[in-house]
């Protein structure tokens, strides 16, 4: 949603100090009118900036500074497909911005393969390896770039944990009670 009114209602309903609640904001909201300003005013809650940054290394590096200092996310996503240099530049920028602002560095999470994609989609884009092999390769790049973790479907968690143990945190967006027809997740599991 891009509705600040709707987001404010959700936050008000979850402000109880008994709850450990975090809020995930994606491109749609953070790029909406006043979206980043609104998020920067949320205090004492965990912010997950799910922006999936993917651009040339210097552009991503420069984009990280204001995100870290203004939005102050606990977690921030980048596409591993941007390459090791882009990821390393992001780690550098997040570390520097955090030090200069005396704030905690966000966890930088690399997106492996979008959970809306399946093997057929990858083949249509010219990829010659499976999703599983792609996630394996991407998780190795994330580790080399010193990311804090990765984002993958729940179907690949065991693979990543077997490869990297607890070195990389693993975030899984594809958890659904059941398949919904208006949901764009292709690779998901039920709890």
Language-model segments: which ranges?
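Conserved anion-binding
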Residues: 59-148, 153-158, 163-167, 171, ...
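Basic, amphipathic alpha-helical patches used to engage nucleic acids or provide basic targeting signals
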Residues: 191
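Short glycine/threonine-rich catalytic loop with a Thr-x-Gly-x-Asp
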Residues: 182-188
